[in-house]
Amino acid sequence: VPMKNDIRAVTVPGAVDGWLTLHERHGRLDLDTVFASAIHSAEDGFPVHPTLSATLHLIAAVEHADLPAAAPAGAVVTRPGSARALRAIARDGRAGFYEGEFGEGLLAAGPDEFVPADLATVQARWVEPIKVDAFGHQIWSVPPTSQGYLTLLSAAIADGIEFDDDGLGAHVLVEAAIQAGHDRPTELFDGADPVRLLDAERIADR
């Protein structure tokens, strides 16, 4: 799969489907209220964080980007495309996104990669969460194909190492994350067994 600048690297986005699935089961506010703050920021603007300012040049070659290719920290920028997408979701739910302007744009950008049926297929599903016990807490995430197991595995590995909270602990956490993810390309796939991925012996081997 190409890393960037290629429509084949793009998947049908499941996050919006996930938001709405959660909202249907647990939401108490209407979608207009839920998205109001985000729409306001996208339409009226928000200050550029220094980290964003330093990385904006990376989108200079991206067509139709709704962020400028350069802006100093503190400058106010808007994201009109994001605002339109959020308004469509608030107004029409799932159809507003997957069958609206965004979905049409995705089909136009990848006519050989996507068909309308791809966007009509429900992306979200309810699954059994996975967890580890680390640092005196239960830490939960979602199973593969999510990368959430990497967070759990990192925490479990780090929990097995004695280190002082002297500022150097960050290095331990980084190394734990590296150990957790070193075999991700071969271990993360549809149907991967989360119990095996978080097995105590596998954690100890790291």
Task: Label each region the model flagged.
Residues 1-99, 103-137, 143-146:
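Noncatalytic scaffold domains of N-terminal-nucleophile
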Residues 24-29, 93-94, 158-165, 184-188:
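Short helix-capping/linker segments at secondary-structure and domain boundaries
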Residues 29, 77, 114, 161, ...:
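Short coil/turn linker and secondary-structure boundary residues
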Residues 38, 86, 154, 173-180:
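Short alpha-helical scaffolding segments that buttress acidic/His motifs in well-ordered protein cores
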Residues 148-162:
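Short linear sequence signals and composition-biased patches located at protein termini or domain-edge surfaces
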Residues 163-206:
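Internal maturation/activation junctions in enzymes
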